[in-house]
């Protein structure tokens, strides 16, 4: 949510960079008090941003937010615990979803469960948009490069 380390940085970024009047955004999380504290800390444009409260374990509350959202950016982790309900709602409501996970097993499960429906509907589910994914991405890249250069093994897909 917006009250965690990455969430606070994201709120600050949007407050400082979102074009006024062109991008409508809100701060979301489980705890109203913590979200209000983030707004106060960030100040500026953030003071006028709506707060939407939902626990990701409450599918009805998640649905209420996602159903009125075009793009959901989630920074609450671990996403294997807190993100599945959000992605499920995003696919059902055709809301694009971006997350910061580095949890490859969870993402594999998401692909298996949601890719076909999301792709058919034009919904973008974009995981691995944070630093957590760098070690996995770099490790995968180095393994593929080694297989290709040292062992002459082609790699069509990872």
Q: Where are the predicted features?
A:
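Short, conserved SAM-binding/catalytic segment
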Residues: 38-47
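Conserved anion/nucleotide-ligand pocket segment
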Residues: 126-132, 136-158
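Conserved glycine-rich Rossmann-like NAD(P)H-binding loop of the short-chain dehydrogenase/reductase
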Residues: 19-34
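The conserved SAM/SAH-binding core of class I Rossmann-like methyltransferase domains
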Residues: 28, 75, 100
């Amino acid at each position: 949510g917006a009250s965690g380390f990455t969430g606070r940085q994201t709120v600050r970024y949007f407050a400082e960079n979102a074009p006024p009047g062109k991008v409508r955004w809100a701060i979301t999380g489980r705890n109203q008090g913590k979200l209000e504290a983030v707004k106060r800390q960030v100040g500026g444009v953030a003071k006028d941003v709506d707060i939407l409260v939902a626990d990701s374990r409450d599918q009805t509350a998640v649905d209420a937010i996602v159903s009125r959202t075009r793009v959901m950016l989630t920074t609450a982790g671990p996403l294997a615990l807190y993100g599945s309900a959000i992605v499920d709602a995003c696919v059902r409501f055709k809301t694009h979803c971006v997350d910061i996970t580095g949890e490859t097993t969870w993402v594999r499960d998401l692909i298996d469960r949601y890719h076909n429906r999301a792709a058919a509907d034009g919904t973008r589910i974009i995981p691995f948009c944070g630093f957590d994914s760098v070690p996995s991405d770099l490790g995968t890249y180095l393994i593929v490069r080694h297989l290709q250069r040292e062992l002459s093994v082609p790699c069509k897909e990872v």
